[in-house]
Structure formats: C-alpha cells, structure tokens
Amino acid sequence: MVQRCLVVALLVVVVAAALCSAQLNFTPNWGTGKRDAADFGDPYSFLYRLIQAEARKMSGCSN
C-alpha cells in the first residue's frame, strides 16, 4: 500500500514537472520586437465596419 502511494506520488510529480517545464531567456537588447501594435488596428476597424453593415441589413429585413 505504501509502495503504491509512493509510485502514485512520483507519477504526479513527474507529470506536473512535464506540464510546467518552460524556458525563459532574457536579454536587455530585446528592442521593440518584430510586430508593431499599429498593425492590428486596421483589421479590427474592418471587422467593426463589417458588423455594422450586416446589422443595418438585418434591421432592414425585420420590417
């Protein structure tokens, strides 16, 4: 019984370690990165206009 509990506890520790493994690299020279936040504004505005147009179409059909 004790041996079974130890095996289960060891298995839980191994699975937890496998799920939590990660690598962290830090460098002071990261800079601004590869992406610019301004690039994401255009698709969102397009989707907003598309949703507005579809809502107008649907409100016209309800009459």
Curated annotation (Swiss-Prot):
Record localization: Secreted
Database matches in InterPro entries: Adipokinetic_hormone_CS (IPR002047), AKH/RPCH_hormone (IPR010475)
Keyword line: Amidation, Cleavage on pair of basic residues, Disulfide bond, Flight, Hormone, Neuropeptide, Pyrrolidone carboxylic acid, Secreted, Signal
Signal sequence range: 1-22
Domain of life according to the entry: Eukaryota
Cited function: This hormone, released from cells in the corpora cardiaca, causes release of diglycerides from the fat body and stimulation of muscles to use these diglycerides as an energy source during energy-demanding processes.
Transmembrane feature ranges: none
Family membership noted in the UniProt record: Belongs to the AKH/HRTH/RPCH family.
Name by which UniProt lists this protein: Adipokinetic prohormone type 1
Keyword flag Disulfide bond: yes
Lineage start: Eukaryota, Metazoa, Ecdysozoa, Arthropoda, Hexapoda
Species of origin: Schistocerca gregaria
Subunit text: Adipokinetic hormone precursor-related peptide (APRP) can form three type of disulfide-bond dimers: p1 (alpha-alpha), p2 (alpha-beta), and p3 (beta-beta).
Entry-annotated residues carrying Threonine amide: T32
Modified sites of kind Pyrrolidone carboxylic acid: Q23
Pfam families the record matches: Adipokin_hormo (PF06377)
GO terms (BP aspect): flight behavior; neuropeptide signaling pathway
Coiled coil: none
GO cellular component assignments: extracellular region
Entry GO MF terms: hormone activity
Primary localization class, coarse: secreted
